[in-house]
Amino acid sequence: MMQYATYSVASPEACASIVWRDSTKSAEAAEAMKLNADNILELNLIDEVIVEPLGGSHRNHDQAALILKNSIIKNLEDLKAFETTDLLERRYTRLMGYGSL
């Protein structure tokens, strides 16, 4: 997951509207939802936080693309060490654990 990306099934405004019936509490909702990459990594929903170029990926697309490419290549190389059945079992176990966060 890119360093400054967010991960969520609903916007903080939607969450605040549902939980507190007040969309103006979106900042509180965003904090509670743990949307940022470091929190998502801590929850074991992702494998890595990919550091972005200074100022964010939107300021230097070429460098961001190169960083992402290198990360993908490295991770694919690491995965080659595993048998397909092992990878599928690891994926299944991980996905089944998401509900117990």
Question: What do these predicted ranges mean?
Answer:
Residues M1-I73, E77:
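Conserved catalytic cores of soluble enzyme domains
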Residues D62-L101:
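Intrinsically disordered, low-complexity segments enriched in small/flexible residues
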